Amino acid sequence: MSGEPKRASLLIVGSGPAAIAAAVTFARYADPSEQCLVLDEMSTSGGQIWRSGSTNGLAKYWLDGMSLPNIHRKQGQVLDVLPQKPGVVFQSPNGETQICLGNDLVLATGARERWIPFPGWTLPGVVGMGGLQAMIKTGLCVANKRVVIAGSGPLMYPVARSVQKAKGKLLLLAEQASFAKLANFTAHLPAYPEKAFEALGYLAKLWKVSSPVGTWVQQAGGEGRLEWVQMTNGKKSWRMECDYLATGCHLIPNIDLARMAGCTIEKDRVKVDSLGQTSRSHLYAIGECTGVGGAERAIAQGIVAGLAAAGQRELSHHQSAALPRWERFVQLLDATFSPRSELLDQIREDTIVCRCEDIPHGKIKPMSCWREAKLQTRLGMGPCQGKVCGPAAKALYGFEPDFPRPPFQPLSAQALFQMYQSENQES
């Protein structure tokens, strides 16, 4: 355990577009003597969206800014948020724990994929959409592999392009949202020209791919791994042989750290004011943890929070005028890509809901709440700590997961001892 806390004027958790925009903006507008410390699990900045050094012009502009001399970066994981001060308990890859303190703390913890379990979803070869994209970017060979993408949300399209670029055989791109919902979404796109042009760019590349709407996965099957997927549009069903099925129902905000910090949560996202300030003093939340709205919104929030942390309050308020427009886009995405009821109705008694602990739907269904299910079945007690099964249990049974408790990642007993020793020294 490192004895002295690591101190910086601004402490940022996360390293995606929102975090990068906040760090770079702070570094440019704060006094040169003030330092910004960015903490992230990944070895490089960019988050999932800018993984592996995106060549996108917008991404390059912000990523280049991370080389400013008053921005420092540490790789590792945040184990806990300090209750009284803007700070966290941090563990480096070598296992060393340390207190990191800032005058202000910014949480930019992003979002994760939402899964709705279906028969066969735990078979090898069935992956999350973002998971498949990440694996392709880090070397998975899908050349000549038959790929079905079926789920919901804008993430489907960059994933499909990743499969195309990797020479995979993209058989199907199926969206579960209804035609009526998608028509309403399209009607609102002119208010977001940057998103409209992005969508047109994907459609120009994907127009040859079969892309039904109002279509979803009923089940997946195979001997030992995925061999086929059964699709339906509610009127008829059909099977397709494939090697990979990438699926997921839009994204959900990562709010565990914010909840642990005592921030107000509203509609399953962190509640913030116009400058990104949470209900807790000197603690900001930006990006997808405040609502899933894409990189442009995340960057806009990061700029506003970075200016506020740098003491440029007037300029920060001026920049925040753009945010209500993006808040409406978040609401539009949520309304369009929410899971249809049929996805919840098709689950069977033997369908696994908690894959860490191998718990089927039939064992969870009689339980009255998350805590009872946890005590009786070990729901949410595996390595993911409810990150996958928690949202599924909420959708299926209306369970509200327990208040999160540190640590947020599996730890050795020694690391756990060091974490609490660090907290006690700082309290």
What label would you give each PLM region?
Residues 16-17, 44, 113, 153-155, ...:
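Residue-level detector of alpha-helix initiation sites
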Residues 395, 402-426:
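Low-complexity, small/polar and acidic-rich linker and loop segments
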Residues 128-136, 244-293:
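FAD-site-proximal beta/loop scaffold in flavoenzymes
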